[in-house]
Amino acid sequence: MMGRQAVDQSQLFYLFNLEEHIPTDHLLRRINPIVTRVLADLREKLAPFYSDIGRPSIDPELMIRMLIVGYCYGIRFERRLCEEVKLHLGYRWFCRLELEDKVPDHSTFSVNRHGRFRDSDIFRQVFEAVVRACMDAGLVKGEGFAVDASVMEADASRYHGKAPGEIDWSAPERQTRAVAEFLTALDGEDADADRKPPKVISPVDPCSAWTAKANKRVQFGYGLNYLIDIKYAVIVDVEATPARTYDEVAATKTMIQRTQERLGLKPDWLAADTAYGTGKFLHWVIGAGITPHIPVWDMSKREEGILSRADFTFDRERNLYICPQGKFLRTTGTVHDGRTIIYRASTRDCGPCPLKPKCTPNMTFRKIPRDLHEDARDATRALMGTPEFAKSRNERKKVEMRFAHLKTHNGFERMRLRGFSGARDEFHLAAIVQNLKTLANHIWRPLLNTPTACVA
């Protein structure tokens, strides 16, 4: 016989225990003890940024827990997050809210984000506390690191980009936090020979970069930079940059130095893709005592049938190249663009040479550029055929898996906040959640695989 549900929701009193309705293997239950430990000294860290008088504020731990919930489940808009926490029993339990407790208003997050959260750099501190928890659990080996960057689309229309000289930054509609942050950074920026001024800039988020990386459509974006420990793919550092290769390589230096200073971690080797294989960066890596497992960025290959630089022999003692015919290519020692030395052959040698059609068909003499840090490039090339290099190249994919998980499972493909500060906030929260999941899975997997396991 077909049953019928009795619809009567007029009961006034219920015997209800929120704890009993959260499954033992639920994600929030698994990460809860870790978060409790990580946030144990949160109030102490934020105390200098609160007044000693006035009404009590919303508990900062409640706001941090709500943000963790949001980034765990792809709820990055605070207005919707407040609605979901209000309705979801599991979210209420994790945020330590009873059924009758009021959920904070969404505007509370904006006020704290632009104020005490950024002033105290609390997201960075929470992130590092989670990394230390991973280290205590044995998830960080500290021998091999991998680095990579992924483009996150900025909250800026790609159709409204303008040349920098066309924008009036003093206009009333331009008086925003993102623009103020950009202008402040512009005033304090040092001139750099390697950096070219942007051709297109966003009026609403000028800190983002005009990019078409990864074969995507042209857009404004930020670079999400991850430095991971290879063993369990724990994110040991994270940095926000414009979506430009130059800035991403520079961010890697910052992350490695900061990881060593704050966490006491220094890798024996570093894995990365070809974008990081410039002579300048390889020189820095080797100078830091780290073995670079990075393919060398080599643009010396010529058309088929044309002699390339590899066909010439470099004489280190005499500082010159020797061509296949035994002629010399010398240099004046002038450094071009801050990184290249040009070696030139003599017109008298190249003119009657029988190999000229295969060597320099369009010029009267042959010239060869040599990177200022070619020694570092040569040392790295010598590593590229080793078994260790092949193994690290395969393990390097773990950092790409981090980006894939973030975009597919967490729905993180477009920025919600603007400016570098907004990007840093979002990237730190994303890394916090990913590390929490890794740590929770490592701790709970043995318990979940034990039939008699009982978790309180």
Where are these regions (language model features)?
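Short arginine-rich
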Residues: 92-96
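Anion-binding and metal-coordination hotspots
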Residues: 4-5, 74-87, 97-456
